[in-house]
């Protein structure tokens, strides 16, 4: 039918590209041939079909085609009017294009399926970091039968991303039938930071005065080692993961004295790739101080003991290691004063030779000027009623400053030249200042607690750059000394935590609360520099808080506060020993707001909660 229409439309005369176009030059010929076109269309079954007669005769050739001498068109050229002719190559291109599109779609879907399978495998096979679901926990460790306890130590011993709690304590146990009576025993215990369960426990031959956990191999992923210093002659290294003893210093090397202070970590002296140690022993019958260098790998002495005759009255200071900006290493120590000795001099005497490692040959000219005598090995640093010594980071410097607590107040010495940066006269200061960022100058400030009347103490924040007081408040507290701590936030601010009795409406409105009876209930208060007129009451306890530490969960940007408390019997004896943990972000949301004074505009509870909910804690050591 298409062929009939195609040949019928080839009218005589001038052809037009469109069927309905009017052309007066050819209109007459078109009228004459119109009847023939109608006859051809009516002969559907018996006449012309597909351009051929029923008898098979060839059709009459087109007059125009004969005149033009055109050849018979190919099949591909015979197409309905209005549809372009398409060569066979185009069909092949279409087929190829369809195949490429199919392959691309298949590859995309296959890649998508493989990616989804890998994601699901990672989600199920790779464990997520353990979330600290226990906002608070408390663990009772039994009755306490010893004297002074070592500070708490926080370290991730099981590599789960959460710091665990290590402490030592002495318990009283019934003796054997032959010995009779009660025998005190010392233990080193590691509690899980997740839920307070016991990870491991190890007996100690004597009571411990300090536990320090660190990696003795710098820059390695070696297992953490815990160094335990006893009150007499014990120095042992424990595997922090298992609690097994790695080595113990032979007490015969301390036959003429006892350990006077915790062990101090030094650079690598014997070049075995492990940092070494130094202990300070004091004579039993004379005030001689003896330094003993100890190998960090084996626990064996690195040379013989080195003795110094020290003249001074007061508390034992140090020893502490100080490394200057140029790399010179000094040991700070003293009795009521601060003196320094170059580690090079101790090493040369211990080895009984004139040479020392290149790392110990560096000198600090400004320190060397303070030698008491030209040939003396001792350097006079400070000598005015020293009670405590701290090393704190100095801003814009590779060295540390020396924060000295004296009977008259507080002094900050520059580490470069040992000159005073500022002094603060403050009576009644006996506890160690707590460093933290209170002002906006990125210089460490200090929280102090001083006795201020009967049953009262004053909490004070001192500006680290000038030594001026920027915040203070009197709180009721009948305990001579309670631990203070701080934690740094992501915006380079610090929250300060301290203990006091309840701040009632009467105590807030009155400046003189001396003589009030102790309530026996102590509250943990938090101070944030953004809201100096508000304290947050986070927790409370009826026991005596003997130690506290703050750790940071780096994964969840949270900080946790660990305390050790002891109960008191009516006779004044210590009873139970309790270790507790509190999540600070949880405490910030659940704590009670205590308004110290009215402000304009008034601080609302909703505004405070919105601010506190955005706080994130980071790990940044204050001391060097």
Swiss-Prot record:
Membrane topology field: Single-pass membrane protein
Places the protein is found: Membrane; Golgi outpost; Cytoplasm, Cytoskeleton, Microtubule organizing center
Pfam families: Beta-prop_FAM234A_B
Residue positions, PTM Phosphoserine: 16, 30, 33, 63
Name under which the protein is recorded: Protein FAM234B
Sequence positions bearing Phosphothreonine: 26
Cytoplasm found in the keyword field: yes
PANTHER family given in the database record: PROTEIN FAM234B (PTHR21419:SF25), PTHR21419
Region span, Disordered: 1-90
Any one of the GO CC terms: membrane
InterPro entries in the record: FAM234, FAM234A_B_beta-prop, Quinoprotein_ADH-like_sf, WD40/YVTN_repeat-like_dom_sf
Phylogenetic lineage: Eukaryota, Metazoa, Chordata, Craniata, Vertebrata
Database matches in SUPFAM superfamilies: Quinoprotein alcohol dehydrogenase-like
Transmembrane annotation, as ranges: 107-127
Protein family membership: Belongs to the FAM234 family.
Keywords noted in UniProt: Cytoplasm, Cytoskeleton, Golgi apparatus, Membrane, Phosphoprotein, Transmembrane, Transmembrane helix
Domain of life: Eukaryota
